[in-house]
Structures are given as C-alpha cells and as structure tokens.
Amino acid sequence: MSQPTYDARAIVLRKTKLGESDLILTLLAEDGSQMRAVAKGARKPASSFAARLELYSVVDLLVARGRSLDIVKEARLESNERLRRDIEHAAGAAPMAELLDRVTQMGLENPRLFALTRTALSSLGRVDPAQVPAVCAAHLLKTLAFAGLRPSLDACVSCGR
C-alpha cells in the first residue's frame, strides 16, 4: 500500500548524513515551521536529488508520510546561481540558516519567516559582496523580532542611556 503524499514548498537549511547514501533535510516550510525529511539515495553520485536539494535554496517537494521522518519523493529546485557559485554570498546565508534552525520548531507556524528568508536569499543573489553583511544582519534582526527575541538596541546595556 502506498504512503499518503503531500506537496511542500520549503527552504533547505541543513543537510545531515544518514547512513551511506541518505540525507536528513532540515527545512523551513512555507508556513514558517521547521520540517525534517529523509532524501533517500541523495548522497549517491548518480542521484537526481543531489543537485536539487542545495543548501539555502527554495524547493518544491513531493513528500510521503513516514513513521518517524517523512520521505522526499520528488524535488524541484528554484536555483539561486550566485549562492551556489560564490563563497561570499553562501557565507552570508549560513548564519541565516543557523538562526532559523534554532528559532523554528516543528508544528509552530510563522509564515513571515519563510517570506523574509526567501526575500533575503533572493537579495543575496543580487547584491555585491560588500553588501552581503548588511543583508545578513537585517535578516538576523528581523528573524529574532519575528521569533519574539528582538534585542533592545535603543539603550546601552551597561548604563541604560
């Protein structure tokens, strides 16, 4: 009997090795919640998944419900060429993904996080390398605010002025 499937749009935040040929994907779903799924065979040299599950990319997925983790059956990539080929731009996306991995939770929806991150990653693909830190910092501050963790920047921590 086949497993029930569903469509999901998500951003790939992290890839973790599982066994010899599989990957566990940590994703930011379109509803802003965290999602984890297995991409079977994604680490094999001839895998079609390898090129379609790039870090910091928006992907359209067909996912089957699994016992503990869902299973990616199909993936379609919205490529961000500059993030893939330029180390400065990819380095700007890394702290964004790390923070999102820490502030998002499975089942806790925050759709503004997906929209913000998609826009920031798209911006990273268009800006000069000198502007990458500004885009990254803006995303980090907005993410903290959307997660209810906005730092107070209008007064000195030491003296309160």
Task: Identify the function of each model-found stretch.
Residues 1-161:
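Non-catalytic alpha-helical scaffolds and adjoining flexible linkers that form interface surfaces
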